[in-house]
């Protein structure tokens, strides 16, 4: 790739529970290279670090699970924190900036396992697969957690029902009650509309043995 102005698409790949972002990056590079697309596609593989991986006091960090729900980071030394979703927002915003990437038309956000949960939840923050005239595609691979857009749940007898005597089942990230600070800014109704507006691709692998 000689210049970012030549980039036509971007892939943001989200790691799983073990947060091995480098492995995900390498695998995606291998796939793109095999399709002769390495000059057209930009690959980004962010890592959500923990306290013990901080290299600077200003680094934001999460515990081993909070990042996948889009929750706030722990405060850095100056008291600032940020939602994990906001970090992806900043990447998407830059990629959709035509002054920076004039030919970029499509962004794929994909995740595996815990990363799949992240992508699934994050899809409820955008409307109709579009951001600043850039197409956003969501790919959810081997997800184990799902956001429900209303308070009903599918029972073993095939019926839908609101659960009784269970106060937490519909709270974020499993439902739209008691939303995280980031999702609260979007609001319950907008989140629900976003959820139904997007096309999201779901994949399940029978031999999924890694996180």
Where are each of the predicted segments found?
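Short beta-strand-to-loop junctions in surface cap/lid or active-site-entrance loops
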Residues: 1-7, 189-193
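Gly/Ser-rich "nucleophile elbow"/oxyanion-hole loop immediately N-terminal to the catalytic nucleophile
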Residues: 2, 69-109, 114
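Short beta-strand element of the alpha/beta-hydrolase
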Residues: 6-17
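Short glycine-enriched nucleophile-adjacent loop
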Residues: 28-29, 116-129
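Eukaryote-skewed repeat-based solenoidal scaffolds used as protein-protein interaction platforms
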Residues: 96, 105-107, 111, 123, ...
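The feature captures the conserved acid-bearing segment of alpha/beta-hydrolase catalytic domains
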Residues: 131-211
């Amino acid at each position: 790739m000689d210049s970012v102005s030549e980039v036509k698409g971007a892939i943001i790949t989200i790691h799983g529970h073990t947060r091995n972002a480098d492995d995900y990056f390498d695998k995606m590079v291998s796939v793109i290279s095999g399709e002769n697309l390495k000059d057209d596609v930009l690959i980004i593989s962010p890592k959500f670090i923990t306290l013990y991986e901080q290299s600077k006091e200003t680094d934001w960090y999460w515990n081993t699970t909070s990042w996948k729900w889009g929750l706030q980071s722990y405060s850095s030394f100056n008291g600032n924190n940020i939602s994990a979703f906001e970090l992806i927002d900043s990447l998407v915003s830059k990629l959709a900036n035509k002054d920076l990437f004039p030919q970029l038309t499509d962004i794929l956000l994909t995740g595996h396992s815990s990363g799949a949960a992240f992508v699934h939840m994050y899809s409820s923050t955008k409307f109709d697969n579009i951001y600043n005239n850039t197409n956003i595609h969501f790919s959810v691979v081997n997800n184990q957690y799902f956001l429900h857009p209303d308070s009903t749940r599918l029972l073993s007898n095939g019926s839908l029902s609101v659960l009784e005597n269970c106060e937490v089942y519909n709270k974020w990230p499993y439902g739209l009650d008691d939303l995280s600070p980031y999702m609260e800014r979007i609001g319950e109704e907008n989140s629900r509309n976003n959820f139904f507006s997007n096309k999201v691709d779901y994949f399940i692998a029978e031999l999924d043995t890694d996180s």
